């Protein structure tokens, strides 16, 4: 089905810079996210018929309700999307609209960049469709403003067609998903549903209830700096310690060598001097045992190095970030079975694969609300080559409507 306001709504959203800030200590991490919620989304939610629309300044969530119009549809279903965009330029987003894409290269604005099917073969899945791309200078923000636009448009459609019967619906738009803290302060009591869906997936058909389990690792290396001319048997180079530590991790267990259910260690930052160095890693795996084994391994490497050095010069700080939500959702697969049924009725093939990442649903599931993830359409997310198909977004709306009418 086509939805008249979808494209304009999406374009309006992506033009607002809501990039999150990993170094911020506030919630939301950037003022622009709160402004987006209060000045754009909240009035629009009220205008399309959502009730009890309210913003929580403590956790940055904007929530609204659409009560059921059929008392026999007793389930309560939630839909969640995040307002922030990833760590890439999001200022002056200038989307391009490619009608009836016929294949071949897409030049991104006046930049020297292009979407080339040889580099991005996923373009071949969208022949004949309307694509929204960047101009090559920013990301697009389909992750996750496509999800916001889809939820909004679905609600607008339902309130404009009161003869369509649906269950109770809760909507939540939250901050800071991209920096991993968006759901930390989520209040379950303010979102009373049986289960929910994040509209935060990628291509058509994605239905996901397995995520990584995730940990952040910070390793500090303490050296001893002396004049290099007299350094023999005295200098301890912290940078060399960092290199030694990194080389003790399995070389093939890095993101660029892994896929499917394989976990990894990912070095995300390395700074320092001879005197002191610091390495930042993320650790990811799907199975609980292998996730724990990865954390034990880095602890053991540090202990071994310290024993060899004769003193504690390698300091490890490990913090769990989120866990594989499969552990929660597989206890009651209702949300998955319902979504599969709706997709199949819409002639959409469910693509059930693990998310090599996390969603807000990872944390919210462990808070007591099973929250799998549904496709929102974005491709090549988090950079200048991001694009989305208007037709895939329309199909996501079809799924939302199907879910609440079948509940």
Curated annotation (Swiss-Prot):
Residues reported to bind Zn(2+) 1: 82, 143, 200
| Pfam families to which the protein is assigned, alphabetical | M20_dimer (PF07687), Peptidase_M20 (PF01546)
How is the cofactor bound, in the record's words? Binds 2 Zn(2+) ions per subunit.
Which PROSITE patterns does the UniProt entry name for this protein? ARGE_DAPE_CPG2_1, ARGE_DAPE_CPG2_2
Q: What is its main location?
A: cytoplasm
- What EC number(s) does this enzyme carry? 3.4.11.4
Q: What does this protein do?
A: Cleaves the N-terminal amino acid of tripeptides.
Protein name in the entry: Peptidase T
Give the originating organism.
Answer: Streptococcus pyogenes serotype M3 (strain ATCC BAA-595 / MGAS315)
Q: What is the lineage of its organism?
A: Bacteria, Bacillati, Bacillota, Bacilli, Lactobacillales
């Amino acid at each position: 089905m086509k939805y008249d306001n979808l494209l304009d709504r999406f374009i309006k959203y992506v033009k607002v810079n809501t990039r999150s800030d990993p170094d911020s200590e506030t919630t939301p991490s950037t003022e622009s996210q709160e402004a987006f919620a209060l000045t754009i989304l909240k009035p629009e939610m009220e205008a399309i018929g959502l009730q009890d629309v309210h913003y929580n300044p403590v956790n940055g969530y904007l929530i609204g309700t659409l009560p059921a119009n059929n008392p026999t549809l007793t389930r309560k279903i939630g839909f969640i999307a995040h307002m922030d965009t990833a760590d890439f330029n999001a200022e002056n987003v200038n989307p391009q609209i490619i009608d009836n894409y016929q294949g071949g290269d897409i030049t991104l604005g006046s930049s020297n960049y292009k979407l080339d099917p040889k580099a991005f073969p996923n373009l071949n899945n969208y022949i004949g469709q309307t694509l929204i791309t960047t101009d090559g200078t920013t990301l697009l923000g389909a992750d996750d403003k496509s999800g916001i636009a889809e939820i909004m448009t679905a609600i607008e459609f339902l309130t404009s067609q009161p003869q369509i019967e649906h269950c109770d619906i809760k909507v939540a738009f939250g901050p800071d998903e991209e920096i991993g803290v968006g759901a930390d302060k989520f209040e379950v009591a303010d979102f009373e549903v049986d289960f929910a869906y994040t509209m935060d997936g990628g291509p058509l058909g994605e239905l996901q209830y397995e995520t990584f389990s995730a940990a952040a690792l910070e390793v500090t290396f303490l050296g001893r700096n002396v004049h290099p001319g007299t350094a023999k048997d005295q200098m301890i180079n912290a940078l060399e310690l960092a290199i030694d530590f990194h080389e003790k991790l399995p070389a093939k267990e890095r993101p660029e060598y892994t896929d499917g259910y394989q976990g990894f260690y990912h070095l995300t930052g390395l700074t320092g001097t001879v005197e002191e160095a610091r390495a930042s890693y993320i650790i990811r795996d799907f199975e609980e045992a292998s996730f724990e084994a990865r954390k034990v391994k880095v602890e053991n490497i540090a202990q071994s190095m310290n024993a060899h050095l004769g003193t504690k010069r390698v300091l490890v700080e490990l913090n769990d970030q989120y866990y594989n939500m499969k552990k929660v959702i597989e206890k009651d697969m209702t949300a998955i079975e319902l979504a599969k049924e709706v997709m199949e009725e819409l002639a959409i093939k469910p693509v059930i694969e693990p998310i090599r990442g996390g969603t807000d649903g990872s944390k919210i599931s462990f808070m007591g609300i099973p929250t799998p993830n549904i496709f929102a359409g974005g491709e090549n997310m988090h950079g200048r080559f991001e694009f989305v198909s208007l037709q895939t977004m329309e199909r996501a709306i079809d799924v939302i409507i199907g879910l609440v009418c079948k509940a």
